């Protein structure tokens, strides 16, 4: 949880200091060593003429520890995650993007990460989930939830959540800061 919140902090700080758009990206592609675990920050670079050159990685990003992963939104949940035993998918808190008002894309195509050279990215399709900050450090996903869970990969490359109460997460405020939940019971009180 702390590493993920740090990525959002770095993204907001980069947006403010470089006065440019910034995205926190989470890998959702087929590489199982990275799926829902690799997190990065990319920012838009402009040339001297003010034209967009592309997006550059802030740093190498990080991978969450094995067994910890990003919980996709409800519309993507069943494509990546299963529950076991008596656990119902409705018991799992899913991430949200809250981008209806801002129009920020929740999925982007990043052909290479990390890239030190500016590269073009595609909006609306690709192998990465995305949360965005504007050049003034505001979240384009105001009120969105970023949820993490613990589980294991099964033979079909789905994450299986054994214990829904082993969840952590945080909310993103419009001003770009993150507010963590201390445990599952706090999430229940706040979100149900």
Model-derived regions: residue spans:
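N-terminal helix-rich module
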Residues: 2-9, 13, 21, 26-192
């Amino acid at each position: 949880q702390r590493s993920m919140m740090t990525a959002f902090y770095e993204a907001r700080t980069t947006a403010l200091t470089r006065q440019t758009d910034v995205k926190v990206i989470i890998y959702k592609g087929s590489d199982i060593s990275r799926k829902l675990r690799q997190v990065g920050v990319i920012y838009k670079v402009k040339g001297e003429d003010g034209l967009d050159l592309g997006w550059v990685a802030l740093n190498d990003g990080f991978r969450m520890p094995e067994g910890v992963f990003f919980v996709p939104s409800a519309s993507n949940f069943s494509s990546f995650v299963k529950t076991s035993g008596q656990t119902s998918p409705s018991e799992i808190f899913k991430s949200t993007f809250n981008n209806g008002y801002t129009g920020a894309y929740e999925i982007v195509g990043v052909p290479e990460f990390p890239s030190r050279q500016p590269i073009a990215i595609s909006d609306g399709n690709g192998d990465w989930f995305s949360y965005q900050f504007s050049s003034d450090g505001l979240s384009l996903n105001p009120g969105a939830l970023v949820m993490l869970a613990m589980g294991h990969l099964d033979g079909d490359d789905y994450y299986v959540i054994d214990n829904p109460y082993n969840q952590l997460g945080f909310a993103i405020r419009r001003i770009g800061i993150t507010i963590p939940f201390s445990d599952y019971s706090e999430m229940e009180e706040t979100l149900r």
